[in-house]
Amino acid sequence: MGAAVDSLLHQRRPAGIVIVISDFLLNRTDYEDALSRLLAARHQVKVIHVLGEIESTGGYPPGLYRVRDAETGELRETVFGPEAAAACRRKVEQLAAAVRGFCTARGIAYAQAFGAGTLDTFIERELPALGVVR
């Protein structure tokens, strides 16, 4: 996200509306810094927080998984079951609350689009609320 913001800011465009679409699965300081730099450049920032249905609900089928840590690249094996699903949902709720809280405190419009099943609702309610469509 930081590199994308750097690229935009180096173009020396006049301030305008910037819509950031991200899963925000990165270090909190990274997205906070990127969004803060957009605000400092006087852009009107709007955030669309996206996650897939399975990721946002912890709806993975139970079983053994081999996963790669996005930060370290390390491969690990993990067993996914009801406890892991609940932990996944808690993490998603915490992440969404952190991003929403950061945005709200700084006047950044925030919309959550988790799962394809919510697409119609998102288009009908959230995009107008963001001021993207009428």
Please report, for each region that a protein language model flagged, where it lies by residue.
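Generic enzyme active-site microenvironment
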Residues: 20-21
